[in-house]
Amino acid sequence: MRKLKYPIGISDFAEMRNNGYYYIDKTNVIVDLLDKGPVEVTQITRPRRFGKSLGMSTLANFLDIRKDSKQMFEGLAISKNTTLCKKWMNQCPVVFFSFKDTDGLTFESAYGMLRMKLAFAFQDYQFLLDDDAISDDDKGIFKRILGLSLIHI
């Protein structure tokens, strides 16, 4: 029998599933979120160390169009819902970042970290700049976000 490791301090779903860590299957939360239909905002509030970042990482890995997550979700509750998996798994562009390591001692430092995280997230989608379906105006906005010049209050 393979000995599983405790995921102390790990909140990345892919790291847990790919590296032999204990994982308590909460993928039915994804089913609950996606079966509700379109909603403008879903707010998830829980105390610290309650699994919010892991839950968001799980959702990001499930939806991200840049990934092939079938094997990662194999054997989990959500994999039994084949209709939902066909409709949603790896079908969406995902921009994901966590604030768990963000120093919020001052507004300026938290804001600076947010700007950098947003620009870094946009780097993964630079291929969109070559897409003819994207307008020149949107490409210009995209480039300014990449250069941090558009992100201001």
Task: List each model region and its residues.
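Short, glycine/acidic-rich hinge or "gate" loops at secondary-structure transitions
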Residues: 73, 127-139
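C-terminal leucine-rich, beta-strand-based interaction scaffolds used for sensing/assembly
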Residues: 2-5
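Walker A/P-loop nucleotide-binding motif
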Residues: 41-55
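P-loop NTPase motor core
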Residues: 64, 68-127
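Phosphate-binding P-loop
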Residues: 32-39
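A conserved segment at the C-terminal end of the G1
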Residues: 57-63
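Conserved small/polar residues in nucleotide/adenosyl-binding loops
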Residues: 151-153
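N-terminal pre-Walker A segment at the start of P-loop NTPase domains
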Residues: 8-31
